[in-house]
Amino acid sequence: MYKNKIIQTCIIYILYIILFSSIIRTKLAKNNIKKNITNIIAYSIRNENKFLVQLYKQKKEKKKLFIKNYELRNKKRINYLKTIFNSLSGSQFPQNSDIDSYNLTPKLKKTVQFFRSLSDNPYNKSQHVILMGKKCQPMPNELKTRQNQVLGCQSTVYIYPKVKLQDDKKVINWLGYSDGLLTKGIVYILIDGLSGYTPEEILKVNPNFISLTGISDFLTMSRINGYLNIMNKIKIFSEQIIKNIEH
């Protein structure tokens, strides 16, 4: 009996040792797992931070390169646009960028000064042009004739001169229409800036003034050509009014 009790006690003791060892190993394993997870997270964060820093540097370098290339492209584009304007408009750019060299009407001069005061942001300027287009007065359908249509525009455009005598002089007020948002804004700039003046004053205006506003920087070549066609149509009407040709 005594031996059996000793054996049972030893077995229970051994089982307790095994159980206790198992518990300790489990805790150690959990601690190791937590430690490993912590190390993995810390390693991931360090690598992620390195990656973000590297990515930021790359973006910064790309931005510098883009700005540098943009400045070069823009310089070439401005020179190219001058050549295009000179050839299409038949008017030469003045030797200096003085606003008075373009023979602008007071209204057009005010418009140029407004666009010059805006930030040099093509999108921002294009939105202002579109907003200006909403100021166009409706044109009666009977005036939307072939004779009043501006050909060679990307959008449909009509221009019509309303002539009145003022101080024994012929003064023109213009009506304009376009189904294109951006083109409509350009139409408004022209009809507003050239309304209330004599045909002689209108004919003196150098169409290349659009380059002073920065608008030509974001126009496609087809829209630049369309703008010059609108100006040409206005000048043809002005010449006809001087010659007493009725509309």
UniProtKB/Swiss-Prot annotation:
Cysteine pairings via disulfide bonds: none
Domain of life: Eukaryota
Annotated active site: 153 (cysteine persulfide intermediate)
Record note on disruption phenotype: Essential for parasite survival.
Classification via Pfam families: SufE
Subcellular location: Plastid, Apicoplast
UniProt keyword annotation of Plastid present: yes
Gene Ontology CC: apicoplast
Keywords, sorted A to Z: Apicoplast, Plastid
PANTHER family per record: SUFE-LIKE PROTEIN 2, CHLOROPLASTIC (PTHR43597:SF5), SULFUR ACCEPTOR PROTEIN CSDE (PTHR43597)
Function per UniProt: Participates in sulfur mobilization (SUF) pathway for iron-sulfur (Fe-S) cluster biogenesis. Enhances cysteine desulfurase activity of SufS. Probably functions as a sulfur acceptor for SufS.
Subunit structure: Monomer. Interacts with SufS; interaction enhances cysteine desulfurase activity of SufS.
Protein family according to the UniProt entry: Belongs to the SufE family.
Name of the featured protein: Putative cysteine desulfuration protein SufE
Species classification: Eukaryota, Sar, Alveolata, Apicomplexa, Aconoidasida
